[in-house]
């Protein structure tokens, strides 16, 4: 199947002077030695810088810790894969037969890595100004989202504020089980709220993480 790279360029709103950069950025290691791994390394740093710079300028009153959490939220793998899906990136990847059969074009890690590689390709082809322009275009709806700062609050804090605003009782977290070897334990936590029928569960490598995941699950249930 022939891959139409011009269509992807239109979706990116960027025309490559050297299309070889884009081809390499779309090539998974399973498809050849000239793959996107080195591009991914470079793209990760470019993305981190551009987002950090944008957040620094947009939020002059935020602390270093707040800016770091916002950046981490915006450049995490799940977010990158989400953006990649929005532009249909999976349709343009060059994958080996094994990855193709196993659905690699849908895999979060592959989509995230490929998007970072494309950002590096744009930088190598058109410089930092071009890369910054494309990054800010891809992230525009997220950077402009009035709820962006909600990610500064952890799930337990968000759940508590939601319950207080809704006049509910505060949640109770119960450690129900610890399993696994001492160096690789898994903690199981249950979250319940008096007067609320829903029950939420969380598992993690420590109690704090398990409680956060249980709180997140409960909040998602309550908010429907």
From Swiss-Prot:
Main location: cytoplasm
Record-linked Gene3D superfamilies: 3.30.160.20, Ribonuclease III domain
Domain DRBM: 154-224
Residues engaged in binding Mg(2+): 40, 113, 116
The EC number(s) this enzyme carries: 3.1.26.3
Enzyme class of the recorded protein, top EC level: hydrolase
RNase III domain span: 5-127
Membrane-crossing segments per the record: none
InterPro entries per UniProt: dsRBD_dom, RNase_III, RNase_III_dom, RNase_III_sf
Cofactor: Mg(2+)
Compartments (UniProt record): Cytoplasm
Biological process, per Gene Ontology: mRNA processing; regulation of gene expression; rRNA processing; tRNA processing
Assigned protein family: Belongs to the ribonuclease III family.
Subunit structure as annotated in this protein's UniProt entry: Homodimer.
Protein role: Digests double-stranded RNA. Involved in the processing of primary rRNA transcript to yield the immediate precursors to the large and small rRNAs (23S and 16S). Processes some mRNAs, and tRNAs when they are encoded in the rRNA operon. Processes pre-crRNA and tracrRNA of type II CRISPR loci if present in the organism.
Protein name: Ribonuclease 3
Protein encoded by which gene: rnc
């Amino acid at each position: 199947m022939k891959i139409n790279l011009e269509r992807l360029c239109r979706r990116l709103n960027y025309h490559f002077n050297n299309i070889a950069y884009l081809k390499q950025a779309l090539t998974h290691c399973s498809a050849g030695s000239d793959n996107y791994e080195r591009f991914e390394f470079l793209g990760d740093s470019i993305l981190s810088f551009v987002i950090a710079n944008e957040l620094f300028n947009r939020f002059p009153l935020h602390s270093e810790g707040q800016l770091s959490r916002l950046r981490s939220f915006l450049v995490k793998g799940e977010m990158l894969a989400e953006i990649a899906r929005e532009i249909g990136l999976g349709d343009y990847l060059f994958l080996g037969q094994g990855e193709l059969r196993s659905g690699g074009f849908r895999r979060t890690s592959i989509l995230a890595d490929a998007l970072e590689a494309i950002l590096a390709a744009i930088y190598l082809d058109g410089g930092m100004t071009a890369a910054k322009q494309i990054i800010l275009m891809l992230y525009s709806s997220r950077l402009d989202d009035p709820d962006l700062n909600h990610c500064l609050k952890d799930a337990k804090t968000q759940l508590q504020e939601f319950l207080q605003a809704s006049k509910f009782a505060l949640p109770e977290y119960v450690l129900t089980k610890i399993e696994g070897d001492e160096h690789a334990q898994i903690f199981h936590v249950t979250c319940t709220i008096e007067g609320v029928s829903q029950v939420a569960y969380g598992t993690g490598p420590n109690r704090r993480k398990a409680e956060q995941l249980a709180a997140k699950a409960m909040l998602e249930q309550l908010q429907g």
